[in-house]
């Protein structure tokens, strides 16, 4: 495979010296870009886009043609793993993802099989290897998965939820059943992420989108415990270099110290946390990624520039910061404003690395 020309992102995650703060955006390949909309229309629907390695590669590369980004992230969905377990994933307009066969009983959980990443999830691996080849070493490729807790919320609820009533009922009334499900999911995610590394992913990220819905103790029991299991089982060295791992719990500001103890390399921060405060709390244990409010991209380029400066100043001098949004970019953001954000990071960050 081609030698990596820009390793700023990987170096920052490992707290090695960099010349500037690396930057990428969660959901950088997405609906805010007209070229993405055109490719998605060509594919027919979202999952057809995910399952076509060439088109998934095309949308992964689109934001890199527009912007000076320091990393590419695999174009896929966190729900590929439960879909491969046979739950029948489909998308309803305005409703988001749904499952034909929710996993809301002990019997349903017992019947679940751990998917083979090279078989049922082979389309993801083909996308990873295609993207890695087409990147030609320009920037590193990030592979990812949802966390066991987050995947379980969709599987038990049958889709998106605002209240998480069904899964919380299972957590408190039938905890053994939920632990069985989370254990199977953790084993599945370990295989899935290690297969991504084997096919060319150079960094890994675990998205715990709904960990913040849990109480203090329940988070440790039902979310963090299983992310810890995954971190322990991951391939951490490939292609002659370390494969950094980032954990991101949206709404997880309460648990940064505990997350940093898992052995991961970096923590993603949402916009509710002050990044300077987070740095003081975790010390030298982990790097930090984040954490501008995605809605700030609706502001003027001047205001975006100011906000970038404020976050850089809050983090302070030295490596260990990957600039990102605090969650995914919104679909109605002006692409020019996303460009202003990225350019501001490149312009303002070098002074913090002298």
Swiss-Prot record:
Stored Pfam families: URO-D
Enzyme class: lyase
Disulfide bridge map: none
Origin: domain of life: Bacteria
GO biological process, one term: protoporphyrinogen IX biosynthetic process from glutamate
Subunit structure: Homodimer.
Protein name per the record: Uroporphyrinogen decarboxylase
GN (gene name): hemE
